């Protein structure tokens, strides 16, 4: 009887099976949570490292792209300068050919200037009776062994404008002055620059290339593709006496 009471007492003091299972279950959950947290941290660190790596690579690619773009811009500028230089050389070549043709034809001609040309000192001028764009006007003058008018001084400008008033009045006449839209320089056909007092008074802002023309007493500028009269010029034949 006494032993049964002791056994009952011991059995009552021992923990219940449910409580022990709960503790085991609680310990298992805590370990799983820690494992998940560790894996999450490792994954986040991996993402952060990958993001930094990709960011560095993107920066490198952007830098290379900017360098390539700068090189491309420089190459385009070099090509543009070469094209302008080639065009200038072609114009000077045509100018030299026209000068030689004029010299040869003058050797067989007794008068200082051809018919329908106006003489002023050492130059002969032809005032066209047709309209054309600037480049076509240039070609028409070359066919006559001359070039578009190149005004060297204010005295020559006064003679031209005075003669035009007597011939046709106030019209527009192309001269051999042009300005490229990229370089912005005014140049005569022989590659020389006009004197500051003979620069055009106004410029068309909408055109890629503008050319000079004479109207009344002024030297102005306009789109080279517009239609105007033109003035040719060549050297007068010197007397062989």
Curated annotation (Swiss-Prot):
Q: What are the annotated disulfide bridges? A: 113-124, 141-232, 211-224
Q: In which tissues is it expressed?
A: In peripheral blood highly restricted on the surface of BDCA31(+) dendritic cells and on a small subset of CD14(+) and CD16(-) monocytes.
Which superkingdom heads the taxonomic lineage of this protein's source? Eukaryota
Question: What CDD domains is this protein classified in?
Answer: CLECT_NK_receptors_like
In this entry, the parts of the chain located on the Cytoplasmic side of the membrane are: 1-35
Phenotype upon changing residue 131 to A: Abolishes binding to damaged cells
GO BP terms: positive regulation of cytokine production; receptor-mediated endocytosis
Q: Which residues does the record list as glycosylated?
A: 81, 223
From the record, give the transmembrane residue ranges.
36-56
Pfam families, per the entry: Lectin_C (PF00059)
* PTM info: N-glycosylated.
Name any one GO molecular function.
carbohydrate binding
Q: What GO cellular component entries does it have?
A: cell surface; membrane
Q: How does it sit in the membrane?
A: Single-pass type II membrane protein
Q: Name the InterPro entries for this protein.
A: C-type_lectin-like (IPR001304), C-type_lectin-like/link_sf (IPR016186), C-type_lectin_CS (IPR018378), CLEC9A (IPR043315), CTDL_fold (IPR016187), NKR-like_CTLD (IPR033992)
Record key words, sorted: Disulfide bond, Endocytosis, Glycoprotein, Lectin, Membrane, Receptor, Signal-anchor, Transmembrane, Transmembrane helix
Membrane-side (Extracellular) residue stretches: 57-241
Its subcellular locations are: Membrane
**Motif segment (ITAM-like):** 5-10
Could you tell me which residue ranges the C-type lectin domain spans?
120-233
According to the record's subunit comment, the protein's assembly and interactions are:
Homodimer.
PANTHER family assigned to the protein according to its UniProt record, in alphabetical order: C-TYPE LECTIN DOMAIN FAMILY 9 MEMBER A (PTHR47727:SF1)
What this protein is reported to do is described as: Functions as an endocytic receptor on a small subset of myeloid cells specialized for the uptake and processing of material from dead cells. Recognizes filamentous form of actin in association with particular actin-binding domains of cytoskeletal proteins, including spectrin, exposed when cell membranes are damaged, and mediate the cross-presentation of dead-cell associated antigens in a Syk-dependent manner.
From the Swiss-Prot or TrEMBL record, give the protein name.
C-type lectin domain family 9 member A
| Originating species | Homo sapiens
| Lineage summary | Eukaryota, Metazoa, Chordata, Craniata, Vertebrata
